[in-house]
Every structure is written in structure tokens, then in C-alpha cells.
Amino acid sequence: MRSVALTLCAIIAGYLLVSNLQNVFSPEVCTLVITGESIRINGCNLSPAHFRAISHLKVLQIHL
């Protein structure tokens, strides 16, 4: 019973370690921020089709 618990803990710890290492070595994060004044795109690899689609986006408008 104890060896099963230790094995499970080792598997979980290994998964967390690998997951964190993947995040460190692949920091490419694509962020799209839409506000009431602008649209900002950071860290994205964009194709011409993406540029055409993004050109039709509008700023966020909320009518209260």
C-alpha cells in the first residue's frame, strides 16, 4: 500500500516537473487585449489571414 502511494507521488511530481520545464522552454504566449480604446496583440505568430481577420475587430463597447 505504501509503495503504491509513493509511486503515485513520484508520478505526480514528475508530471509537475515536466510541465514546468515545458513552460520555461516554450515562453511563446499569444495575448489579445481588447479594451474600450484599443486592441493589442503581443507575442503572436500571425499570417496574412490573421491580419485580415484582426482588421475587422472593434474595441469593446459596453452600453450601461
UniProtKB/Swiss-Prot annotation:
<keyword id="KW-0813">Transport</keyword>
<keyword id="KW-1133">Transmembrane helix</keyword>
<protein>
    <recommendedName>
        <fullName>Movement protein TGBp3</fullName>
    </recommendedName>
</protein>
<dbReference type="GO" id="GO:0046740">
    <property type="term" value="P:transport of virus in host, cell to cell"/>
</dbReference>
<keyword id="KW-0916">Viral movement protein</keyword>
<comment type="function">
    <text>Plays a role in viral cell-to-cell propagation, by facilitating genome transport to neighboring plant cells through plasmosdesmata. May induce the formation of granular vesicles derived from the Endoplasmic reticulum, which align on actin filaments.</text>
</comment>
<feature type="topological domain" description="Cytoplasmic">
    <location>
        <begin position="28"/>
        <end position="64"/>
    </location>
</feature>
<dbReference type="Pfam" id="PF02495">
    <property type="entry name" value="TGBp3"/>
</dbReference>
<feature type="transmembrane region" description="Helical">
    <location>
        <begin position="5"/>
        <end position="27"/>
    </location>
</feature>
<keyword id="KW-0472">Membrane</keyword>
<keyword id="KW-1038">Host endoplasmic reticulum</keyword>
<keyword id="KW-1043">Host membrane</keyword>
<keyword id="KW-0812">Transmembrane</keyword>
<feature type="topological domain" description="Lumenal">
    <location>
        <begin position="1"/>
        <end position="4"/>
    </location>
</feature>
<dbReference type="GO" id="GO:0044167">
    <property type="term" value="C:host cell endoplasmic reticulum membrane"/>
</dbReference>
<dbReference type="InterPro" id="IPR003411">
    <property type="entry name" value="TGBp3"/>
</dbReference>
<comment type="similarity">
    <text>Belongs to the Tymovirales TGBp3 protein family.</text>
</comment>
<dbReference type="GO" id="GO:0016020">
    <property type="term" value="C:membrane"/>
</dbReference>
